[in-house]
Amino acid sequence: MGEQQKMTIEEAIAILDPETRRAALFGYRYFGGFRGSEAVLAATEEACRVAVRVMQEYLEKKGGEPT
């Protein structure tokens, strides 16, 4: 991925939630140096990375073991 763009937790939720995914991804015609379907894929992958980070932080706070 070219330039790194920061994605908020709220943006990641909107992309990953089936109820809001289509509308959220509409604005991602350009993302991370990509365009079109590659930009949508890059945004979705970044949303997944954000979600994984949040879940790992949650597990650490709960005393679980992150992977």
Label the predicted regions.
Residues 1-3, 11-65:
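Short interaction-hotspot residues at assembly and binding interfaces
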